[in-house]
Amino acid sequence: MSYLIKPKGYKALLDLKQTELGIKQIKDFFQQNLSSELRLRRVTAPLFVLKGMGINDDLNGVERAVSFPIKDLGDAQAEVVHSLAKWKRLTLAEYNIEPGYGIYTDMNAIRADEELGNLHSLYVDQWDWERSITAEQRTVDFLKQIVTRIYSAMRRTEYMVCEMYPQIKPFLPHDIHFIHAEELMQKYPDLSPKEREHAITKEYGAVFIIGIGCELSNGEKHDNRAPDYDDYSTIDPSTNLPGLNGDLLVWDAILDRSVELSSMGIRVDKEALLRQLVLSGQEHRKELYFHKRLLDGSLPLCIGGGIGQSRLCMLYLQKAHIGEIQASIWPEEMRRECAEWGMQLI
């Protein structure tokens, strides 16, 4: 079911031409900074992959992929990607990327089951990145180091935007706050996971929640994760809590809520994959191409994630609807209401 937040007194700070220029400047500047911070080289990525190889991502495990038959391959089914987490790991192996270096790509996807609204579109564009690591770097401390570098690139980009458009004021705090999903649940035991995100992000401005996908002490998960990319089950000795992954959120004063900008994490090794397949009841995946490659040791240890391009632009340019940043399909009633409210959808 679609939703629409209509911010009181909303007025776009940039017109259409300024917005288009701003989008280009943000994308060029941020990806250059991301590449420099994490030592990533750009690679070309697929829009679709063959079905049944375990390469496409299942996200929360329930979304349907857009698919179509390929005539020249005997009507074999191809799927439009959800994201490229597993494809990137295969590419690290193919390019023989050493620890300390990685890849990034412009990822375009279609998520047909998305609930449409201010922050959610059928069309997804993000920087998908992946970096080879050593076994010693599979820790929460290393995860935090990478998150901090990404956040530094975000703050530099914000400075550039505010210099280009003085009517836009900076909003990101100097530092990002880290908290485990278990600690967050203990802090706000009476709130739902989404309400906890809003509460903690409003307090700190920018937050990274660790351990997305692991079972908390109340028997629930903060959110679901597919079992075969992020490692959400390994216990970190420094915290004695499970999970080497998480979500990066910032506070959006326009929409008066938290916004997830990135989902990322240290990826499963052989032991974590086997454990998470058992926990999720999906041991049959061991027979898929990607999973066989991981289990036979031919894929590198890595860390990676995705960073939403349209959401990042939306926040920097202080827009109220993601449709002010990207071209997509929206319910006619939503288009009408947005026009009445000053949200000019592309």
Predicted regions and their residues:
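Generic recognition of stable, solvent-exposed alpha-helical segments in well-folded globular domains
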Residues: 21-25, 29, 138-145, 149, ...
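Extended, charged alpha-beta segments that form solvent-exposed binding/catalytic grooves
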Residues: 105-199
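A glycine-rich phosphate-binding loop feature that marks nucleotide/adenosyl-phosphate handling sites
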Residues: 47-51, 166-173, 212, 333-335
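Class II aminoacyl-tRNA synthetase-like tRNA-binding/catalytic domains
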Residues: 2-120, 128-132
